[in-house]
Amino acid sequence: MAPPKAEKKPASKAPAEKKPAAKKTASSTDAKKRTKTRKETYSSYIYKVLKQTHPDTGISQKAMSIMNSFVNDIFERIASEASKLAAYNKKSTISAREIQTAVRLILPGELAKHAVSEGTRAVTKYSSASN
């Protein structure tokens, strides 16, 4: 048997009691202050690209989290592959050449071609701006 249902009573509208504010000493607040750790994400950049391609489309927090994880994963794969390539060639520095080769190895076909051309364009733009 199911337990009998309790009768619903309207919530009372009485104001909540105000408690006196606790006095804080300078030493106790300084010891408990914590700086909020910053979480670095690509959210603002993903949002800008979304608005360039689809101005009237939004993105949910969960979808943004998935996109952020995707970007982190791709960057990690490229960096790892570029690191291996530098080690094979007995170099201690990852250059644009290693990144380009890593992109060609990781991304498939046409996507790799577009990524390489956009990357080359970005590096050229950066180089001309810094001169």
UniProtKB/Swiss-Prot annotation:
Stretches with biased composition (Basic and acidic residues): 1-20
Region (Disordered): 1-39
Gene3D superfamilies: Histone, subunit A
One CC-aspect GO term: nucleosome
Pfam families documented for this protein: Histone (PF00125)
Database matches in CDD domains: HFD_H2B (cd22910)
Function recorded in the entry: Core component of nucleosome. Nucleosomes wrap and compact DNA into chromatin, limiting DNA accessibility to the cellular machineries which require DNA as a template. Histones thereby play a central role in transcription regulation, DNA repair, DNA replication and chromosomal stability. DNA accessibility is regulated via a complex set of post-translational modifications of histones, also called histone code, and nucleosome remodeling.
Subunit relationships: The nucleosome is a histone octamer containing two molecules each of H2A, H2B, H3 and H4 assembled in one H3-H4 heterotetramer and two H2A-H2B heterodimers. The octamer wraps approximately 147 bp of DNA.
Protein known as: Histone H2B.2
Source organism: Scheffersomyces stipitis (strain ATCC 58785 / CBS 6054 / NBRC 10063 / NRRL Y-11545) (Yeast)
